C-alpha cells in the first residue's frame, strides 16, 4: 500500500511540474509555423502533390488493365482429369490413358511423348 501511495504521489508531481518548459514549446510552435511558408516547404508540398497525381494515374492504369482480363486463365496441372470444358496447361496435352479403363474414365493432362 505504501508503494502505491509513493507512485501516485510521483505521478501527481510529474503531471504538475512536467510542463515546466511551456515557453520553449511555444517558441518551437512559432518556428514551425514560420517554416511552413518557406520556399523549401512549398517545394516539398509541390513534390508531394506531384507524387499524389502520379499515384492517381497509376491507379487508373491498373484498373483498366484489370478490366481487360489480361491475366492468363487458370488451368489444371499434370495427372489431373481434363475434358472439353476443362483445359490443360500450355505444355500438357489431354490424352486418354491406357490400362484400367474402369479406373480412368476420362482423359488426363500428361506431358506429350517425344517419341
From Swiss-Prot:
Q: What's a GO cellular component annotated to this UniProt protein?
A: extracellular region
Signal sequence region: 1-20
A GO MF annotation of the entry reads: sodium channel inhibitor activity
Cysteine disulfide partners in this protein? 75-89, 82-94, 88-109
- Subcellular locations according to the entry: Secreted
Q: What does this protein do?
A: Ion channel inhibitor.
According to the UniProt entry, the note on domains is: The presence of a 'disulfide through disulfide knot' structurally defines this protein as a knottin.
Q: What is this protein called?
A: U17-barytoxin-Tl1c
What organism does the UniProt record list as the source? Answer: Trittame loki
Its taxonomic path starts at: Eukaryota, Metazoa, Ecdysozoa, Arthropoda, Chelicerata
Amino acid at each position: 500500500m505504501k508503494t502505491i501511495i509513493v507512485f501516485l504521489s510521483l505521478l501527481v508531481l510529474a503531471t504538475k511540474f512536467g510542463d515546466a518548459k511551456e515557453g520553449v514549446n511555444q517558441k518551437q510552435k512559432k518556428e514551425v509555423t514560420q517554416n511552413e511558408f518557406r520556399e523549401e516547404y512549398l517545394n516539398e508540398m509541390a513534390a508531394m502533390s506531384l507524387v499524389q497525381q502520379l499515384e492517381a494515374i497509376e491507379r487508373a492504369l491498373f484498373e483498366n488493365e484489370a478490366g481487360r482480363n489480361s491475366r492468363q486463365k487458370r488451368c489444371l496441372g499434370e495427372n489431373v482429369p481434363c475434358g472439353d470444358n476443362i483445359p490443360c496447361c500450355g505444355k500438357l496435352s489431354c490424352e486418354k490413358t491406357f490400362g484400367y479403363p474402369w479406373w480412368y474414365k476420362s482423359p488426363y493432362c500428361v506431358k506429350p511423348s517425344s517419341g
